[in-house]
Amino acid sequence: MKLQKQVTVPKIEIDLSRIKQLSQEHGDENWEFRSWLKQYAPDDIDGLVKTLSQKYFALIDCMQCANCCRSLHVEFKKSELHAIAKTLGQSIEAFQKQSMSEGKVNPPCPMLNGKLCSIYENRPDVCRSYPHLEQPEFTSRLIGVIDNVAICPIAFNAFEELKAKLAWPRP
């Protein structure tokens, strides 16, 4: 995989309204990049994305954002659901009735207290791994990634730098 040696890295963007706006403006571009990216070996892309993810996790504090917690419908594992309900002092049935629909937790997450998760140390796997950049087979998950780019500053910045590092010939 050939990477640009001298890359002009886009300015780090953390303003959520700007990220949403830029994601909408880059919508067609992101879909074209998605197709173009598939020419690369998945393992090579996974390694590069992992590096970018770690870079932006070090630069951006999730606990100052919590946009994912305010925006997403999240599906927990049954075992996690039991632990969450217990932590909140509720039965699973009461938690489901109060906080869920169609098997997913309604936003904003009921465990969100301001911008902090009240069960952060015991948060579910889906929350712990969000925005899922370091999971294998990045190029097979690009529809979800593009959705996350509009919500998460870490995903947005990593995705924009990925375009720059790969010298994507923008349309």
Predicted regions and their residues:
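Short loop/turn segments that flank or connect secondary-structure elements
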Residues: 1-171
